[in-house]
Amino acid sequence: MLNKDANGFQDLDPQYSFISKVHIIASKIKPEDDEKLHSILDESDIRDWESRKGLAKVLQFMERSWIETHKNLRALISKERPDFIFGDLLDQQACVDMRNEFNIPMAIHFGQMPFHLAPAKYIPGLPGFQQRYLTSEHASIWGRISEDFFALGLVFSLRHHFRWRKQMRDQAGAAPLAFSRKPDSLILVNTFFGFEPPKELPPLLVPVGPILSDNYSPLTPELESFLSTHKNVLYIAFGSHINLTGGSRFTKLFDGINSAIQSGFIDGVVWTLKPPKTSSSSSNPLPNFDPKFYHITPFAPQRAILAHPSTTLFLSHCGASSINEALFHGVPILGLPIYNDQFKYALCIENVGVGLKMDKTDFEAKEVHQKIGRMTTEPSFQQDSKRMMGIARIAARRKHLAADLIEEELLDHEGRFSLSSKSDVRHRRPPHLQTASARMSWFRAGNYDIYLVYALVLGSAWWIGKTILGTGIKLAMGKWLR
């Protein structure tokens, strides 16, 4: 809802006129810090122990903003007293703190299923960070074990970060964060089952994606002309933070794409490509793109391109928004994930048959050529993309469900509490979407107390029966011996 300007994301988008005021609760990131952090992410490899140290630094930098956010948000809420808090994953800590302190209903938005909530035994490893298997269905026992060991190693490598976070909160006088396997507030997830592996969910954890605008920017005249004169166009975009200009990755992509053009798999390329950095442009100049086959632009109306019938393939970093848009418009995806949740989405596109993925650390031009060839000639990719497009377009209506659930939470919260004074807050009812198991111990919720009683009764009956039978046999044997 905010427009980006030279001073940060602080200008209201005019189409959201219902927003009356914006409060800035944290400082914007400096451009040099932003570039440094994304450079670390670009070169990181979550499989490598040393590389994880860099990821921990990025995570620590991002979470350090909690200090300022918590302070300013607390002052704002003390003064304004909002009726509802709707936060993002990155601001979850501060939002939870405010909810607990001021007793305000809350919802949190996640881009993918939270790895720590509603775990399923048939989903191996750490959900969202799996290396090969999204579920145990087709995984060997060793594959499942390897996913578990990878998850343990990942958590262990972040142990210092968890300790640092606790110290940061302790120094600020904040209450410890409670860990729960079930949500205690509304969680809205921008995904949908069919793309995300299905699993059982508690009522407070709701997939409401793909969340997409009903309107989007149209094609420019130049793009319209290019797409209308080509039949099989490859669209390439790597988001707003990843810069592939220069370096070996760019060279491999460019060589592989040229080979695909020469083989007739594609006849055009629309490439959203940022200008190279001044420091590297002399040593790694961009090649001369043949305008017959290439349309290069620093910015492109992505949804309009994906919606065009000439767009037959999308080469993407597998960011959440790009994946949702490609699924909605039925375009197969060749994924080159770079960091974070992009690896999970790359696994998902292969799992549902709408794409293939490449490894950023060891892919070659030959692989780019071969996979473009497969995806443009094998009908299964188009068929599965069409299937997922239908599912995604129906699922996209659930953004209205998200709004309804927020309204439900607000009304339920107002009715559940009796406020006789500022210091007297009494619960009248539990949250209407919270399962009873979330308010019970694992022992009681799992009926283990009942199982224990059954075991004691059966064990006692077995012991009594054994004792009576043994006594009877001894008496009978005594009489027989006489």
Swiss-Prot record:
Q: How is it used?
A: Phaeomoniecin D was found to show anti-HIV activity, antibacterial activity against methicillin-resistant Staphylococcus aureus (MRSA), alpha-glucosidase inhibitory activity, as well as significant protein tyrosine phosphatase 1B (PTP1B) inhibitory activity and thus is a promising candidate for drug discovery projects.
**Pfam families, from UniProt?**
UDPGT
Protein's name according to its UniProt entry: UDP-glycosyltransferase 1
Give the originating organism. Answer: Phaeomoniella chlamydospora (Phaeoacremonium chlamydosporum)
The family database entries (SUPFAM superfamilies) matched by this protein are listed as:
UDP-Glycosyltransferase/glycogen phosphorylase (SSF53756)
Q: Which family does it belong to?
A: Belongs to the glycosyltransferase 28 family.
Question: What top-level branch of life does the organism fall under?
Answer: Eukaryota
What are the alphabetically sorted keywords of the record?
Answer: Glycoprotein, Glycosyltransferase, Membrane, Transferase, Transmembrane, Transmembrane helix
* Cross-referenced InterPro entries: UDP-glycosyltransferase, UDP_glucos_trans, UDP_glycos_trans_CS
GO CC terms, sorted? membrane
Q: Which reaction does it catalyse?
A: exophillate aglycone + UDP-alpha-D-glucose = exophillate + UDP + H(+)
